[in-house]
Amino acid sequence: MQEAKIKESVEEIVALALSGKGAEAWEEFYHESIEKIDLDGVSIKGKPNVPSANHSLLGSITEVRTYEHAGSLVKGNRSFIVWNVDFDVKDTGTIKVTEVCIQDWEDGKIITERFFA
């Protein structure tokens, strides 16, 4: 997949996420064999399993103060999306962090997604 196409896809993912349509991004851009590794280091594999984990976290958020896109970069078949987040999670507390989402692309879809802070 060409860098220009990945860049276009990343821009669409960011727009969907910021407009509350993250599920649409999952349907369109994530590979069936996706592996997601979140900030806690836990690996979740398979497209059907990742959204349920995401919904669990999203359902526990009690307040959002900041959710903003801080930048993106594409190099080869890898994209980097930087997010600034500040929100409260039930039974966890405040999560305030700048995180980098690193995505590897295969066949026009994200095959691996890792988060670092």
Summary of predicted features, one role per range:
Residues 98-117:
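Short beta-strand edge/turn micro-motifs at domain boundaries
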Residues 1-29:
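Short, low-complexity N-terminal intrinsically disordered segments enriched in polar/charged residues
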Residues 60-62, 86-96:
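Short, cysteine-centered beta-strand-loop-beta hairpins and adjacent loop/turn segments enriched
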Residues 72-78, 104-109:
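A short, structured loop/turn motif at beta-sheet edges
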Residues 4, 23-77:
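A solvent-exposed, acidic/Ser-Thr-rich amphipathic alpha-helical stretch
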Residues 65-68, 82, 94-101:
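Short, surface-exposed coil-to-beta transition loops
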